[in-house]
Amino acid sequence: HTNFAYAYAKRMLEVQSRAYKIQHGLNYNCVTPTNIYGKYDNFNLESSHVVPALIHKCYIALVEDTPFVVWGSGNPLREFIYAPDVAKLSVWALDHPEHSNMILSPGQEVSIKELVFEIAEAMDFDGEVIFDETKPDGQFRKPTSSMLKHVLPDFKFTPLEKGVTETVDWFVKEYGNCKK
């Protein structure tokens, strides 16, 4: 299963917004975040993105005292952004139409393996972690533009450790109520 249509749609935002400006004089602000994670996310194992899915899988492994099994080698690299950072940057983008097409990313690639161990630590999971290399890794890298760092060099992104810990704490507390 692939997300090529989702990725393509994100790329088309910029093209469409430019076309509206040229043809109709309309200004649109398109912000395209990398992998968003945080409280209130969709933690459903069938339909969630990587961070909430891994948090949910780790929680199940913890509660059931089973290994935390992760698809693939853990080597692919991704960029993650905490939802409150996306909110702050989106509000900023509305006030700065000169930066109408911006990829929201801390500009730091993290391996899936690093993410898995960050989640396991935040969850206090000390069981076995298995990377099932019979399952696909997906694309190795999905690099993004670092234009945001040039435009807002002083913006302080939430460190992955802090964002993951806050998300894990919320998920555990709200397990009975959250979307899963």
Model-predicted regions and their roles:
Residues 1, 42, 46, 73:
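Active-site "substrate specificity/gating" loop of NAD(P)-dependent dehydrogenases
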Residues 46, 50, 111:
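Short acidic-hydrophobic sequence patches enriched in Asp/Glu that either
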Residues 60-180:
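C-terminal substrate-binding subdomain of Rossmann-fold SDR/epimerase-dehydratase oxidoreductases
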Residues 8-13, 22, 38, 83, ...:
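Structured catalytic cores of enzymes that bind and process phosphorylated ligands/cofactors
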Residues 9, 47, 141:
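Short, conserved glycine- and acidic-residue-centered signature motifs
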Residues 1-34, 50-64:
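Active-site Tyr-X1-5-Lys
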Residues 39-42, 147:
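Short beta-loop-alpha junction of Rossmann-like oxidoreductase domains
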Residues 33-36, 73:
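Active-site loop/turn elements of alpha/beta-hydrolase fold enzymes
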